[in-house]
Regions:
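Short acidic/polar hinge/loop motifs at secondary-structure boundaries
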Residues: 123-147
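Extracytoplasmic beta-strand/coil segments of soluble accessory domains associated
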Residues: 78-121
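C-terminal beta-signal and terminal closure region of outer-membrane beta-barrel proteins
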Residues: 403-405, 409-411, 583, 600-601, ...
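C-terminal beta-signal and adjacent terminal beta-strands/loops
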Residues: 411, 686, 781-784, 835-844, ...
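N-terminal periplasmic accessory domains that precede
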Residues: 77-83, 104-107, 155-176, 191
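Surface-exposed, low-complexity loop segments enriched in small/polar and acidic residues
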Residues: 214-216, 220-231, 259-294, 300, ...
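Short loop/turn motifs that connect adjacent beta-strands in outer-membrane beta-barrel proteins
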Residues: 37, 168-171, 184, 200-201, ...
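N-terminal Sec signal peptide and the immediately downstream disordered periplasmic leader
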Residues: 1-74, 79-84, 192, 196, ...
Length: 917
C-alpha cells in the first residue's frame, strides 16, 4: 500500500544542511538512523534511475532546499542559480539587455546553456527558461555536476539541474517580499501562495506566484552612464560612430570626401569637417537598460491518487506567463542609406552614404509576451517483489510573441532621402524630405512613416513518453548485497516554428530575418543501468560498489548514438567514501542549428588592418593586402562590428564528449558533524557545434598572399549585405568595415575544461540554538577552446574575453568561485551571512599600461535576519550590502563591464513576510 510520500532519512539529512555534496551526509548517519532508513521508501536521486534508500552515488550532487533559497534573499530562481559556484561564463538574465529576449539560462562549467540540461521532476520542459520555475513551488534543487547523457539523453554534457517541486504539501503557505536597490530604483517584488491537502488515498497541491522587476537604467550608474575606451593608459569618452547628426562619405570616385572620412556637418557651425570620435560619438547608454524589467505570473499544481493497491495515478501541471522587455539605442542607417546629390540639405552636392542614429524614435524596445505550459500525467506503482515502475506522458509548449518597436523601414527612410523617389510616393510626399545631417530633425510624422513594428511569434513543443522499471535482485544478490538495476524506454518529439513579421517577409525591416523557420524531429531511446556491490563489511572495505549504464538513442535524422557511463564507490572505512565516474556524452543539433534561414547580424570582430603601418606584429603580406584594399597606414574604425550572415545547416551533426570525475567524501570521527567533499572533474568536447570565428576568418584571409586563403571565400563583401562598398576594396563597405562574412553551424570547435569542486559543512549546538557553517566552491584549472581547426587554442581559465557560447560577448571565467555561509538560529529567530567570492580575471588582450588588464578579486556580502512569531516569519536582509560596484572593462560595448559575470545593480535591501497554516 502507498502512504503519503515522505523523503528518506538520507535526503532529509542532506537538505537540512543545504548545499553540500549529498553523499557527504551518508557517512555521518548513526546506526540507529541507518536502521530507521530500512523502513523508508526508496527514492530516485538526480543522476540515476535506480531507486535507493539513501542518496549515495558515484556522481557528485549538490542539493539545495527551500530554506537555502529563502536565505539567499532572491526574488527569482535565476539569481540563485547564477550564484552557484559551478556556474561560470555567460548566462542570460536580468543583467543582459542585449540579446537575452527576456529569458534566463544556466551555464554549468561555462560550457553553455545548450549543454546544461534543466529538468522539472526529472523531465524536460520545452523552453528551458528559468523564469518559468516559480520559487514558491520549489521543494529542492538537485545539481548534478557530471555528464549524464546516459541517464537523460542529449544536452546533459556539463551536468543537470533538476528542480523538484512540492507534491506532498499540507496546509497554506503565503509569502510576500519587496526589494529596493540602494540607489532607490530597481524595485522587485514577489507574492506567492501554496495550498495543499492530503488523505490516505492521495494528495493535491496548487501554487500561485507573481513576481515583478522594475527597470534600472545604464545612465543611473556611474560605471555605465557613458561608454569609455582607453588611450595611452587613460579613459576617454566614446560611443558609436553612427551619431544623431550623421557620419558620411561620398560615393563619387575621386571626390575629396570619398576618402579620409567619415565626415560630419558640424552641429554648431554648419561647416563640413572630419568626424572626431571624442566629441561626435553617440552615447548609447542613455537609452539602454542596465537591469531589464519583467512581470511573471505562474500557476502550478500536482496531484496523486491511489487507484488500487500499489498503483497510483499522478498529474502535474504548470503555466507561466512572462511580460518582459529590453531597451537599446535607436536604430541607425547602417544599411547604407544614400542621400542623393539633389537633396536640399546635402552639404556637398554629391551622393553620400550616411550612418545616422534615429534618436527621435526613442530607441529600440523589445517586448516579449512569453507563455510556458507543461502537463504530465502517468501511473506509478510497485510489483509484489518490490520492484517499482512508472509510465508517464509529458507535454510541454512555449509561445514567445514578441513586439519590437522602433525598427526602421529601410524602404521608407530611403524615400525620405531621395527627392525624386519621394515625389512619386504619396506617403513620403505627405511627410516630406528628412534632413539627416541635423540632430532632432525627424518630425513625429516622419518617425511614424519610417518606423515599422516587428512582431514575430516563436513556438516550441516537446512531447515525451517514458516508461521505467527499477528494482534489485533481492535474496539472489551477491554476498556483498543485492544488485540494483533500472531500465526504461523513451519516445520524444520536438518541434519548433518561427513566423516572422509580415514586414520582415518582404524585407522592409532592417536587420530582421525575413524567412520562417520550421522543423521537427523525433527519437527513440532505451537505457539500462546497474549497481553491483562487490565488497561489504570487510576490514579493508566497508563498501565497494561498481555501477554502469548504457543508452541507445535513435534520431530520425542522425545515426544511432550509444553512450556509456561507469562509476566506482569505495569506502575503506565508514567515514571515507572515494568515488569516480567516466561518461560519454552527446548533444544533438537544435532545430535552429539545422533549419534557420540566413539573416544579417552585427558581430564584433578584430580588424587586422587597424594602424597596420605601425603594427610591429603585422606581416609584410598583411600590410600589402591592407594597402591593396585602399586603406591608409593609420586606418582606424569608430567601432569594430561586421555585418555578417548567419543561418542553419541541415548537415550539422551531434557533438560528442567525455567526462571524468574523481573525488572523496570524508566525515572525520574526531570532528563531530563535519563533512568535507572534493571532486576533480574534466570534460572534453569534440566536434562542438559552432560557427566560424569572424575574427579568425578575416585574419586568415588577410594573412594569405593576394587573398589566396580559402577563408576569403567566406567573406561575401558589401554585395552580400546590400550596402555600398569602399572604393578599391572587395571585402569592405563604404565605412571600411569587413562585411558579408558567412557562417553556418558546423562541428568545428573543441572544448576542454577541468577543475575541482569542494564542499564542506559543519554544525554545532550552541546555547539555545545551532551554529551552521557551509562552504562550497569550484576551482577552475583549465578552460581551453578552439573555434576551428587551425585557429589558436584559447585558455580562458582565470581570464576574461569573448565567450564562445554567449553570442560573442565578453565574460569572466574566474578560477575560484566560492560561497561561504554562516548561520545561527533558535526557535524564535535566526541570522545568516553569505560571502560570495570570485577571483580576479586577466584581460585576454592585456597590454602594457592598460587600465583594465585585470579586474581584481570580488567579495559580495549578503546578510539576513528572521523572527518567528506563531505562524508568521518576518525577514529583513540585504544582498551586496556594501554596494560593491562591478569592474571596469575597456572597449566593451555593453555597460563598460562584464555584466553577465558581476553584480551590476549594487546593494539591494529587502523585507519579507511569510505565513504557514
Amino acid at each position: 500500500m502507498f502512504t503519503n510520500t515522505k523523503l528518506s532519512k538520507a535526503v532529509r539529512l542532506a537538505v537540512a544542511f543545504g548545499a553540500a555534496s549529498t553523499a557527504a551526509f551518508t557517512g555521518s548517519v548513526s546506526a540507529q538512523e541507518a536502521e530507521e532508513a530500512k523502513d523508508v521508501e526508496r527514492i530516485e536521486v538526480t543522476g540515476s534511475r535506480i531507486k535507493r534508500t539513501d542518496i549515495e552515488s558515484a556522481s557528485p550532487i549538490t542539493v539545495f532546499n527551500a530554506e537555502d533559497l529563502a536565505k539567499s534573499g532572491h526574488v527569482t530562481i535565476e539569481k540563485f542559480v547564477h550564484s552557484i559556484p559551478a556556474m561560470n561564463g555567460g548566462m542570460n538574465g536580468s543583467n543582459t539587455n542585449n540579446g537575452s529576449g527576456g529569458a534566463a539560462s544556466a551555464n554549468l562549467r561555462g560550457l553553455g546553456a545548450a549543454r546544461t540540461l534543466v529538468l522539472i521532476n526529472g523531465r524536460r520542459y520545452a523552453s528551458g527558461d528559468l523564469n518559468s520555475i516559480p520559487m514558491a513551488f520549489i521543494e529542492r534543487v538537485e545539481v548534478l555536476r557530471d555528464g549524464a547523457s546516459t541517464i537523460y539523453g542529449s544536452d546533459a554534457i556539463a551536468g543537470v539541474i533538476n528542480f523538484i517541486t512540492k507534491k506532498n504539501f499540507e496546509g497554506v503557505e503565503l509569502t510576500a517580499q519587496y526589494d529596493l536597490a540602494g540607489e532607490g530604483d530597481g524595485e522587485t517584488s514577489r507574492v506567492g501562495a501554496t495550498i495543499g491537502t492530503s488523505s490516505d488515498k492521495g494528495n493535491v497541491v496548487i501554487s500561485l506566484e507573481y513576481a515583478n522587476r522594475n527597470t534600472i537604467w545604464q545612465k543611473d550608474r556611474d560605471f555605465s552612464k557613458q561608454p569609455f575606451a582607453e588611450s595611452g593608459g587613460a579613459l576617454i569618452p566614446t560611443g558609436s560612430g553612427a551619431n544623431a547628426f550623421g557620419t558620411w562619405v561620398s560615393t563619387v570616385p575621386g571626390s575629396q570626401y570619398a576618402t579620409g572620412g567619415p565626415y560630419v556637418v558640424d552641429p554648431t557651425t554648419g561647416a563640413v569637417r572630419k568626424y572626431a570620435p571624442a566629441t561626435d560619438s553617440y552615447n548609447y547608454a542613455t537609452a539602454s537598460y542596465l537591469v531589464t524589467p519583467q512581470d511573471v505570473f505562474s500557476i502550478n499544481s500536482a496531484a496523486s491518487y491511489e487507484i488500487a493497491d500499489d498503483v497510483k495515478a499522478f498529474l502535474e501541471g504548470g503555466y507561466t506567463n512572462r511580460q518582459s522587455d529590453q531597451l537599446m539605442a535607436a536604430d541607425a542607417t547602417f544599411w547604407g542609406a544614400t542621400v542623393t546629390a539633389d537633396h536640399p540639405n546635402n552639404p556637398i552636392g554629391e551622393d553620400v552614404v550616411i550612418s545616422r542614429r534615429l534618436t527621435e524614435t526613442g530607441g529600440r524596445s523589445f517586448n516579449q509576451d512569453f507563455s510556458d505550459f507543461r502537463m504530465v500525467t502517468g501511473f506509478e506503482g510497485f510489483l509484489e517483489n518490490g520492484w517499482s515502475w512508472d509510465v508517464s506522458y509529458n507535454y510541454a509548449r512555449y509561445t514567445d510573441a514578441s513586439l519590437d518597436i522602433g525598427r526602421a523601414n529601410t524602404k521608407r527612410y530611403n524615400l525620405m532621402l531621395d527627392p525624386t523617389a519621394c515625389a512619386e510616393d504619396a506617403g513620403c510626399t505627405a511627410v516630406g524630405l528628412w534632413n539627416p545631417f541635423q540632430a532632432d530633425s525627424l518630425t513625429p510624422q516622419q518617425v511614424a512613416f519610417g518606423s515599422i513594428p516587428n512582431s514575430p511569434v516563436d513556438t516550441g513543443v516537446t512531447k515525451q513518453f517514458m516508461a521505467n522499471l527499477t528494482g534489485d535482485t533481492g535474496d539472489f544478490g551477491l554476498e556483498a548485497g543485492s544488485i540494483g538495476w533500472a531500465t526504461g524506454v523513451e519516445k520524444r518529439w520536438e518541434s519548433y516554428r518561427s513566423i516572422p513579421d509580415g514586414g520582415a517577409l518582404i524585407g522592409e525591416i532592417y536587420g530582421v530575418v525575413g524567412e520562417p523557420t520550421e522543423g521537427a524531429y523525433d527519437l527513440d531511446e532505451a537505457y539500462a543501468e546497474i549497481n553491483v556491490p562487490i565488497l561489504a563489511g570487510l576490514s579493508y572495505a566497508e563498501r565497494l560498489d561498481f555501477s554502469a549504464a548504457v543508452r541507445s538513442t535513435n534520431y530520425n535524422f542522425l545515426q544511432s548514438q550509444i553512450t556509456k557511463k561507469f562509476g566506482v564507490e569505495y569506502s575503506p572505512v565508514t567515514s571515507l567514501l572515494v568515488r569516480a565516474t567516466y561518461a560519454d556524452g552527446f548533444r544533438a543539433p537544435s532545430i535552429t542549428d539545422l533549419y534557420s534561414p540566413q539573416a544579417e547580424s552585427n558581430t564584433p570582430y578584430v580588424d587586422p588592418c587597424l594602424e597596420y603601418a605601425t603594427n610591429g606584429s603585422a606581416s609584410a603580406t598583411l600590410k600589402a593586402n591592407c594597402a591593396a584594399e585602399g586603406l591608409p597606414g593609420n586606418f582606424l574604425l569608430p567601432n569594430n562590428q561586421s555585418a555578417t550572415l548567419e543561418g542553419g545547416n541541415p548537415n550539422v551533426g551531434p557533438e560528442e564528449s567525455t567526462s571524468t570525475t574523481v573525488g572523496f567524501v570524508y566525515t572525520p570521527e574526531f570532528v563531530e558533524n563535519l563533512t568535507v567533499a572534493i571532486d576533480y572533474y574534466k570534460v572534453e568536447i569534440d566536434g562542438a557545434i559552432g560557427v566560424p570565428n569572424i575574427s579568425a576568418v578575416i585574419q586568415s584571409c588577410y594573412d594569405s598572399p593576394n587573398f589566396s586563403s580559402a577563408s576569403c571565400a567566406l567573406i561575401g563583401g558589401p554585395g552580400a549585405v546590400d550596402r555600398p562598398g569602399l572604393q578599391g576594396s572587395k571585402f569592405r563597405d563604404f565605412q571600411g568595415y569587413v562585411v558579408g562574412v558567412t557562417g553556418a553551424p558546423s562541428n568545428i570547435a573543441t572544448f576542454e575544461t577541468a577543475g575541482y569542486d569542494f564542499d564542506a559543512s559543519w554544525y554545532k549546538d550552541l546555547g539555545t540554538g545551532r551554529l551552521n557553517v557551509r562552504l562550497d566552491g569550484t576551482y577552475l584549472t583549465e578552460y581551453s577552446y578552439q573555434s576551428q581547426e587551425g585557429a589558436d587554442v584559447l585558455d580562458l581559465a582565470g581570464k576574461y574575453g569573448i565567450d564562445p557560447n554567449f553570442g560573442g560577448r565578453a565574460v569572466a571565467f574566474s578560477k575560484l568561485r566560492t560561497n561561504l555561509t554562516l548561520g545561527y538560529g533558535t526557535d524564535d529567530w535566526n541570522v545568516s551571512w553569505i560571502g560570495r567570492f570570485q577571483s580576479n580575471v586577466e584581460n585576454m588582450q592585456a597590454a602594457p599600461n592598460k587600465v583594465s588588464n585585470e579586474t581584481g578579486a570580488y567579495v559580495y556580502h549578503d546578510v539576513q535576519g528572521s523572527y518567528f512569531y506563531d505562524n508568521l516569519t518576518f525577514t529583513l536582509g540585504a544582498r551586496n550590502v556594501f554596494d560593491k560596484q562591478p569592474p571596469y572593462v575597456s572597449n566593451n560595448n555593453d555597460m563598460n563591464t562584464l555584466n553577465s559575470s558581476y553584480d551590476t545593480a549594487g546593494a539591494y535591501f529587502y523585507g519579507r513576510v511569510s505565513a504557514k497554516f
